[in-house]
A protein has these predicted regions:
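Conserved N-terminal alpha-helix of the aminotransferase class I/II PLP-enzyme fold
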Residues: 22-79, 84, 102-110
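Short conserved active-site loop signatures built around small residues
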Residues: 1-18, 210
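PLP-dependent enzyme catalytic core of the Aspartate aminotransferase-like
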Residues: 90, 108, 117, 135, ...
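Conserved PLP-enzyme active-site core in the AAT-like
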Residues: 5, 67-301, 424, 429-431
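Conserved small-domain helix->loop->beta segment predominantly found in fold-type I
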Residues: 262-271, 276, 280, 286-287, ...
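Short loop segments at secondary-structure junctions
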Residues: 22, 213-216, 338-341
Length: 449
């Protein structure tokens, strides 16, 4: 006889990890219904897992959106979005000229081999986006805060142009995070994240998310999106709209076709780790944003720095976009143009001690990158010029270290070119807006392009 043992009192405050590749069904009828997508449930971990679902739900709420699909990386999330929107018709994409270099590689090389075409446009000049539209344009792609130059786009105007021309707006919200900006409230139809960065926050797990804000409805122009609105054997002779609903059809296709067939899925352990990171997102991002603004203001006075790329030094229009565009912070990424030769730039990088040289952002550790040699090294000369990056540009992604320690490290590294002419301590009592006003004497890249 087996003795009955009562369940112990108390429940875990952290959700358990469901580390299982497959799921058992009570009956064949249940399995048949789930696999035919006539009932909800899990079929195989490639398309769903309880931990992954929890992460998707959390990010959907943060973005104030409709639904989300988690992927193995941010690149995978972008790829699924573009395949689901432009792949079936060899569509055309209008993309920001100030994108992360890996996204440029994806657009101009790998996806170009599938028939996708792209035209780049300045995110600060909506007229360039209007001029780039063709009859095949299906997607506008841009970043809410650009990586690496941290400029803000004319998002609402650009989104209006896209929607007038039947295009879907995808916004990469990795740098801003939903804590600082929610693109769906400003015209975005889809939002993508490299969850590796700020959502995770500790430089460990690799993951991505594709989020549908609920603004895109393919039934408003069904002939433009037939792979979403017409029946197909893949969906049991139904359309994705019939299976998932108009506002979830796109991500239904992204998950059950492209994620299922290509396999860039997120593991249960990764989803669990990213969810733990999200629990401290607000605290981390607010500190990183404040520290980045302080460092940018300090470096704007340094004789070894020719220019600072940060929204508070981007000129009047950038300030207006920040104040009126729905931003709740400027993020933890900024860049500088070093006032020196290529050899001196390299010496500055190699002289940093606390700040590490690495190709990542959003870590609790402050990192530096040389975009021309690293993240943007495969750009063509034309793309490189349009990006605003130079061989003297250094990108910083600010962590959680003390601002005084970071300032000291930057000053000792920059001293190979010139010593600071004043102590940053004189500015510490000023709020960030006052520091920005005091430092506005240097020319901005945005004032001359």
């Amino acid at each position: 006889m087996t003795e009955h043992v009562n369940a112990p009192l108390g429940t875990p405050i952290v959700a358990p990890i469901h580390h299982s590749a497959a799921y058992a069904f009570a009956s064949l009828a249940d399995a048949r219904a789930v696999f035919a997508q006539r009932a909800s449930g899990y079929t195989y971990a490639r398309t769903g897992n309880p931990n992954v679902t929890a992460l998707e739900s959390a990010v959907t709420k943060l973005e104030r959106a409709e639904c989300a699909v988690a992927t193995s990386s941010g690149q995978a999330a972008v790829t699924l979005a573009l395949l689901a929107l432009a792949g079936p018709v060899n569509g055309h994409v209008v993309a920001s000229s100030h994108l992360y270099g890996g996204t440029v590689d994806l657009l101009t090389d790998t996806l170009a081999e599938t028939g996708l075409t792209v035209t780049f446009a300045d995110p600060r000049r909506p007229e360039e986006w209007e001029a780039a539209v063709t009859s095949q344009t299906r997607v506008f792609f841009l970043e809410s805060i650009a990586n690496p130059l941290a400029d803000l786009p004319e998002l609402e105007t650009i989104a209006d142009i896209a929607h007038r021309n039947g295009a879907v707006v995808i916004v990469d919200n990795t740098v801003a995070t939903p804590h600082l900006f929610t693109p769906g409230e400003h015209g975005a139809d889809l939002v993508v994240h490299s969850a590796t960065k700020y959502l995770s926050g500790h430089g460990g797990p690799l993951g991505g998310l594709l989020v549908d804000t609920g603004n895109f409805d393919p039934t408003e122009d069904p002939q433009r999106w037939p792979w979403l609105t017409t029946s197909h054997p893949r969906w049991g002779d139904r359309s994705p709209v019939e299976v998932y609903g108009a506002k979830r059809a796109l991500l239904g296709v992204a998950r059950c076709k492209y994620l299922n067939d290509l396999g860039p899925c997120m593991s249960a352990i990764t989803a669990h780790e990213i969810l733990q990171g999200i629990s401290t997102l607000g605290v981390r991002v607010e500190r990183q944003s404040a520290t980045a603004a302080s460092l940018a203001a300090t470096l704007n006075r340094h004789p070894a720095v020719a220019r600072v790329h940060h929204p508070q030094f981007g000129g009047a229009r950038q300030e207006e976009l920040y104040e009126q565009g729905g931003y709740r912070g400027t993020g933890g990424v900024f860049s500088i143009d070093v006032n020196g030769t290529p050899e001196q730039v390299e010496h500055v990088v190699d002289s940093l001690r606390l700040i590490k040289l690495a190709a990542n952002i959003g870590d609790v550790r402050t990192l530096v990158a040389h975009p021309a040699s690293m993240t943007h090294c495969r750009l063509t000369p034309e793309q490189f010029r349009a990006s605003g990056i130079t061989g003297q540009t250094l990108r910083f992604t600010v962590g959680l270290e003390d601002v005084a320690d970071l300032t000291a490290d930057l000053f000792q590294a920059l001293s190979v070119i010139a010593d600071a002419t004043e102590s940053p301590a004189a500015w510490e009592h000023l709020p960030h807006t006052a520091r920005a006003t005091a430092h506005q004497q240097k020319d901005s890249f945005h004032d001359h392009h």
